[in-house]
Amino acid sequence: MRLLHVVTLVSDDGIFGGPPSVAVAQSAELAARGHDVTLMALWRGSGPAPDRIGSVRLRSRPARALLPGRGCIGLLHPLLVRDLWRAMGGADVVHVHAGRDLVSLAALAVAAVRRVPCVAQTHGMVEPRTALPVRLFDLLYLPLLRRARACCVLTGHERRLVARVLGPDGPPLRILPNGIRPGPPEPEPRRPRDPHVVFLARLHPRKRPEAFVEMARLVHQEMPEARFTLYGPDDGSLPAVRRLIDEGPAGVVRYGGALDPAEAHEAYRSAAVHVLASVNEPFGMTVIEALAAGTPVVCTDTCGIADELARRGAALVTDGSPQGMAAAVRRLLGDPELCARMARAGRRVVEDVYSIGAVADRLEEIYRGGGRDERTGGGGTDHAAREADGRPGQEPATPSPAP
């Protein structure tokens, strides 16, 4: 098949979060299976856009802020619309990694006008919102999203939220977890790693980097040899993080800036523990990346895949408080055998549930119009589906156009 994937923004600092890495991983696996795949996006970086990301062909335009002050959702380039029109003329299926943003709106509109089969994937970015700018945007956006052949969601919880947004006239909602290609296993027996704990995410209030710094302070009180690093682009929380670091003991916590994918992989591989402090995380792609690198994970009980990981012994799940996360980190740093067991369990869960091969199998089925209709009902393994359904004020994976 000739496939066109569209994602809002690809950048060298990862500011748009998980959707670009998911789009690249899916595109690479589909291309390896013989499909003709192109990825189209805006580009923001210190240099010109690459022609390829790994094995994936990239067509891009420089990101321009058409709606100033709206972050990634207000980005577009006028010529990207022309590029979309031309590219869809030869596509069998268009896969839009869709948020409430101008690029997604343009891609869905062009697919509708050109009558190209379209699959949307919302990545936790389309949730019920009542703010006036969102309601105005949705007057254009939702009718286009309802025309998709299918809409892919991460978990049962996200399926219920998207169903509330789209209503009874929405497309079939298909659960599609994120996937990753596991790296080579570590030699046995697993060698203990230095007591280095990492945070890899945007520095955004929902990601709770300040809670990570507070957790680090508590761990350091009992384990003074431990060191902590936050990696990721600033999305509003860096000033508060720097202030907390400066107020704490010198040399214990540092901010390492944004990482490219290769640097992030090395950060996972060298860390003793990865901590995802986020609340109401729709999925938690960094968790899967850490597990694939053989790194034990601590996460909160509102992470979308927390129950699955806990059931398989692949993560320590906490209540999200700095005290709870600190206790979990101390437990891992003090027990090399537990770390080794969790590393093995993490690799198994990636291979069994979150492999990119299984995701591509599912995508091929969806592209061909098959698969089980999942418009309604429960399912999924997410704790958030039970505890947070309908909770007001939840944040999507990337900023939405709310004031």
Residue spans for each PLM region:
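Short alpha-helical donor nucleotide-sugar binding micro-motif in glycosyltransferases
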Residues: 88, 258, 266-271
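Conserved donor-binding/catalytic core segment of Leloir-type glycosyltransferases
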Residues: 4, 188-217, 229
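Conserved acidic donor-binding segment of nucleotide-sugar-dependent glycosyltransferases
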Residues: 311, 315-323, 331-336
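Short hydrophobic beta-strand element within catalytic cores of glycosyltransferases
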Residues: 296-300
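Nucleotide-activated donor-binding/catalytic signature segment of Leloir-type glycosyltransferases, i.e.
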Residues: 239-262
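Glycosyltransferase donor-sugar binding loop
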Residues: 200, 227-241, 257
